[in-house]
């Protein structure tokens, strides 16, 4: 097996214990392979008070445009109880056609495929392939995500780097390789409602003001009617309550306040501001003069965004269809990713491995999928340049 094969590269990366925020040797391995291939490689470290310093990697080969960026992360979530794994979480063992290890799917396997495809492409097209290839890789995606991609992009912009398109190798396929390309992501908004009452004894309710019925009224106002009916590329926005609490262990005390937390995953019909205004309007209408409440809205750094289907999306879809025989769906489902930052630098889409076992005990990827994803990325490179 060649040490440039996606399997060998993925095994080497998995054997680096890069549990966020630790680098674990993963970025160093990647930097070595890229520099040996002729890339200019830099390793900026970013800091933020109250968070760990994070190592990142930026590499580029070529000086001309267009510039295609491969993006991803080498940090992984903790493995949990290692004794529960059939094969060690950092062993990189292969059994029954599967590569096991933390990050096999999310997303060291994807990075290995990007690297393998790029090395093979350069072997075919050196010295001039009519553009530039860049790697934008962070060690802070599974953690707070404040010293990673968002700062790496600012750092690159300050140096005059400009990108034409980005392919982010997150695991996008629910069950089978080739099912799905992510062309956008929903936004996220968290809200905290506090209904204010007056504490008292349950036997003397006229001396108290129970906040719980008011909170139930407000919660019903937010869930009774849908926020929207969805858009061309997004499902309907969805609001879910995640906790309701009065902090009251006593059975004979009316609490002074009642609190609830909700999260909205919203589509491109809304911004955080317009959605917040609609939520406040519904609450105020339901409360009238009968319910005293306060609302704290916390937008994440995850606005809804969409990369419009274009020639680049078609190139990736064509490559997938050529290797898998299926035309991928263009989707905006799922949670957030670093694409939410990259979208401000250039058009970005996501395509990677099958995500069924990501973050699980015995996370694993089919070795055949590593080979096929490498071939897909190779076809993208051939079509792009």
Curated annotation (Swiss-Prot):
Required cofactor names: Zn(2+); Co(2+)
One GO MF term: acetylornithine deacetylase activity
GO terms under biological process: diaminopimelate biosynthetic process; L-arginine biosynthetic process; lysine biosynthetic process via diaminopimelate
Cofactor note: Binds 2 Zn(2+) or Co(2+) ions per subunit.
E.C. designation(s): 3.5.1.18
Positions contributing to Zn(2+) 2 binding: 106, 142, 359
Entry keywords, A to Z: Amino-acid biosynthesis, Cobalt, Diaminopimelate biosynthesis, Hydrolase, Lysine biosynthesis, Metal-binding, Zinc
Subunit structure: Homodimer.
Name this protein carries in UniProt: Succinyl-diaminopimelate desuccinylase
Organism, as annotated: Methylorubrum extorquens (strain CM4 / NCIMB 13688)
């Amino acid at each position: 097996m060649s040490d440039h094969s996606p399997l060998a590269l993925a095994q080497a990366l998995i054997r680096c214990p890069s549990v966020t925020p630790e680098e674990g040797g993963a970025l160093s391995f990647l930097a070595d392979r890229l520099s040996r291939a002729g890339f200019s490689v830099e390793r900026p470290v970013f800091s933020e008070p109250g968070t760990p310093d994070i190592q990142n990697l930026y590499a580029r080969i070529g000086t001309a445009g267009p510039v295609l960026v491969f993006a991803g992360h080498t940090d992984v979530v903790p493995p949990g109880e290692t004794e529960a794994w059939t094969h060690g979480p950092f062993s990189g063992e292969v059994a029954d056609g599967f590569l096991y290890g933390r990050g096999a799917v999310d997303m060291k396997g994807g990075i290995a495929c990007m690297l393998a495809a790029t090395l093979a492409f350069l072997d075919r097209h050196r010295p001039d392939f009519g553009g530039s290839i860049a790697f934008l890789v962070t060690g802070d995606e599974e953690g707070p995500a404040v010293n990673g991609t968002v700062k790496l992009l600012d750092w690159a912009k300050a140096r005059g780097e400009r990108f034409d398109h980005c392919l982010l190798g997150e695991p996008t396929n629910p069950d089978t390789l080739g099912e799905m390309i992510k062309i956008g992501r929903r936004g996220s908004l968290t809200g905290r409602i506090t209904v204010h009452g007056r504490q008292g004894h349950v036997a003397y309710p006229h001396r108290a003001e129970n906040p719980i019925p008011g909170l139930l009224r407000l919660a019903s106002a937010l869930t009774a009617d849908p926020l929207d009916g969805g858009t061309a590329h997004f499902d309907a926005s969805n609001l879910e309550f995640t906790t309701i609490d009065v902090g009251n262990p006593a059975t004979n005390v009316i609490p002074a306040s009642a609190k609830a937390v909700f999260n909205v995953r919203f589509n491109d019909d809304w911004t955080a501001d317009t959605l917040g205004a609609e939520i406040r309007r519904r609450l105020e209408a339901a409360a009238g003069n009968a319910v005293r409440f306060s609302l704290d809205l916390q937008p994440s750094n995850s606005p809804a965004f969409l990369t419009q289907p274009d020639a680049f999306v078609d190139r990736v879809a064509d490559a997938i269809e050529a290797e898998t025989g299926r035309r991928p769906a263009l989707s905006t489902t799922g949670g957030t990713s670093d694409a939410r930052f990259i979208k401000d630098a250039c058009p970005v889409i996501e395509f990677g491995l099958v995500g069924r076992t990501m973050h699980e005990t015995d996370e694993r990827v089919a070795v055949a999928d590593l080979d096929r994803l490498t071939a897909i990325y190779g076809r993208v490179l051939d079509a792009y340049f």
